[in-house]
Every structure is written in C-alpha cells, then in structure tokens.
Amino acid sequence: MIREVRREDIPTCVNLIRSSFITVAEEYGITKENAPRFTAFAISDDRLYWHMDKEHRPMFVAEEDGVLCGYCALLIQENGECELNHLAVLPQYRHRGIGKQLLEHSYTVAKSMGCHAMNIGIVEENTVLRKWYEQNGAVHIGTKKFDFFPFTCGYLRREL
C-alpha cells in the first residue's frame, strides 16, 4: 500500500533511505569520506522534517504488513517540472514491484499537481537502475561529473 508520510514516520524513513542507499554505496565504492553528500550519508531526520514542514514536498511510503519498506518524495518546481527524490526500497523487499508502485504513484501525483515532466538523478555507473527507469518510461538525457562525488551523476526525464 502506498500512502503519504506521516510526521511520526520520519525516523523510520531516514533508516529506510540509508539502508537502501548504502547498498549502492558499497557496490560502487562510495564512502562517507569520499562522498559525504551522498544520500546514504547525508540524509537525516532534520532534512526530512525540513522537506515536510518548510518545502511541503509530497512524500510517500510503501507499507507491507505494517513495515515501511519503500519511500520517495517529489520536489515540485515552479517551471512545471518536478524532481523525484530518494526513491528507496529496503533490500529485503526488492524485486517485488514496490519501487515500480512508488514510481507510478509519483508520476500520477506529479501530473495531478500540474507537472508536465519529472527529472530523476542516479549514479550513472548503476546501469541496472538506469535500465529500470528506462523500462518505466524515463529517457536518459545526460550526465555530469562533480568534484564532490567519486561517481558520475546520470539524469533521466519522464514526460508526464
């Protein structure tokens, strides 16, 4: 079941995001030392409370049998576009369609809020994730290398 994040869910969501993103960090040699701004290391309760209270981001969780097992959020932009943030599924819940449900829910919500496109950022070297987004309607639009990350940022876009 996909539902909106409640305030009391925030600490659990932070742990869920960390647990999900740390698998990517481990696979691609991303550490707190070489990429302190990577989601696995930079996410915090305060940051998610800020997203909820100050930025009013739509935030969603997937819940199965009382367990919060997936998360994502949207950053709505003034140009009619939005950005998908922190799509995460706990490792033990992967390959069950939860990520796809969250992604499709995000597409629907973004469109209902007047967005005409969704932008998505990934670790470009994660070709499995890139292919998954492409299979779910996103188009790869480019890459960018930042000095503060030991990986290349990949960008995808889905017209809504």
Please place each PLM-identified region on the residue numbering.
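A short, internal acetyl-CoA/4′-phosphopantetheine-binding micro-motif in the GNAT/acyltransferase core
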Residues: 87-94, 122-124
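Acetyl-CoA-dependent GNAT
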Residues: 4-10, 15-86, 90-91, 103-105, ...
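C-terminal "cap" of GNAT-fold acetyltransferases
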Residues: 116-130, 134-136, 142-160
